[in-house]
A protein has these predicted regions:
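Feature captures the catalytic ectodomains and active-site-proximal regions of enzymes
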Residues: 1-168
Length: 168
């Protein structure tokens, strides 16, 4: 399978295990790059980092900018959704919490957002508070018929109850 990355993901993984990358530096160009990869109709993983939420707004204590960036991303989601194939799974999460309204610039929250959607996804469920962030990795592994990681529990069956996996 192909592994495409957008943003600083290539640096985070030392350019290992990546088939194609587009190293972007802001949310808008990251969204545009993601849309371009989706239009290429590849089979595999598209891993996108939206750097501004963390670097520009979260760690810089800018709640208004953070809110504006969220609204801009929300406006891009319909475009992304329109490019999805019937078997695609989108997972939106953060790697940590940074509350831009609190004093200091360190990570502030244990819990992060976790949203999943796609054409075959049961979007009317609450995944609850997951035991570990590794659940995302376990879900991706199951989706691609890979061995489960040592940690984490897949929530794929909650998203697509009638199918053990959604990717061919």
């Amino acid at each position: 399978k192909t592994v495409c990355t957008v943003g600083k993901i290539d640096d985070i993984f030392a350019h290992r295990g990546i088939t194609r990358s587009n190293h972007t530096h802001d949310n808008a160009s990251s969204c545009d790059a993601a849309l371009k990869f989706l239009k290429d109709d590849f089979e595999g993983l598209l891993f996108v980092n939206l750097i501004e939420f963390d670097m520009i707004y979260g760690h810089r204590n800018d709640p208004r900018g953070y809110g504006d960036a969220l609204e801009a991303f929300d406006r891009k989601l319909p475009e992304l959704e329109a490019q999805l194939r019937t078997t695609d799974l989108v997972i939106i999460a953060a790697d940590h919490g940074v509350d831009p309204t609190t004093p200091g610039t360190d990570h502030t929250r244990e819990h992060i957002p976790l949203l999943a959607f796609g054409p075959r996804i049961n979007c009317k469920i609450n995944l609850g508070i997951r035991e570990t962030y590794s659940d995302v990795a376990a879900t991706i592994a199951e989706n691609f018929h890979l061995p489960p990681p040592s940690f984490g529990s897949s929530f794929l069956s909650s998203l697509v109850p009638d199918s053990p996996s959604i990717s061919p």
